[in-house]
């Protein structure tokens, strides 16, 4: 029997995923990290990106908007600001959020918070890419 590891993806609102998996690739702060069973203990920051999860020979994606990941004793815990399985993403809503962020960035007003608009744009693009 192939070795597996537990993956828990948790947000402040809910547990998004909690099952045994074969492999995960996560968007670490310094680049992508591939985690196999019995990986060395690790704690890292996550950036906005997509978790790619292999479970039972099939792959699926989870869009995350930053957070932290801990790997210990063949258990992976992802504490994310937000997390959404690709098959549950409302693409039209994500496209609308992208358009709003682009409009804010293109506005000439001085009251715009450019940093927040850039983050919103990056998150919306990530959700759209994950759903593809």
UniProtKB/Swiss-Prot annotation:
GO terms for molecular function: ATP binding; proton-transporting ATP synthase activity, rotational mechanism. GO terms for cellular component: plasma membrane; proton-transporting ATP synthase complex. It is found in: Cell membrane. Keywords: ATP synthesis, Cell membrane, CF(1), Hydrogen ion transport, Ion transport, Membrane, Transport. It comes from the Bacteria. Its main location: membrane. Belongs to the ATPase epsilon chain family. Produces ATP from ADP in the presence of a proton gradient across the membrane. This is ATP synthase epsilon chain. It comes from Desulforamulus reducens (strain ATCC BAA-1160 / DSM 100696 / MI-1). The gene is atpC.
């Amino acid at each position: 029997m192939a070795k597996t590891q537990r993956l828990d993806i948790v947000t402040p609102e809910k547990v998004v995923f909690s099952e045994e998996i074969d492999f995960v690739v996560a968007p670490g702060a310094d680049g992508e990290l591939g985690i196999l069973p019995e990986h060395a203990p690790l704690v890292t920051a996550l950036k906005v990106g997509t978790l790619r999860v292999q479970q039972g020979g099939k792959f699926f994606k989870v869009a995350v908007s930053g957070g932290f990941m801990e790997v210990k004793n063949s258990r992976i815990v992802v504490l994310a600001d937000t997390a959404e399985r690709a098959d549950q993403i409302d693409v039209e809503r994500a496209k609308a959020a992208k358009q709003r962020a682009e409009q804010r960035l293109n506005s000439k007003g001085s009251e715009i918070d450019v940093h927040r608009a850039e983050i919103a744009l990056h998150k919306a693009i990530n959700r759209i890419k994950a759903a593809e």
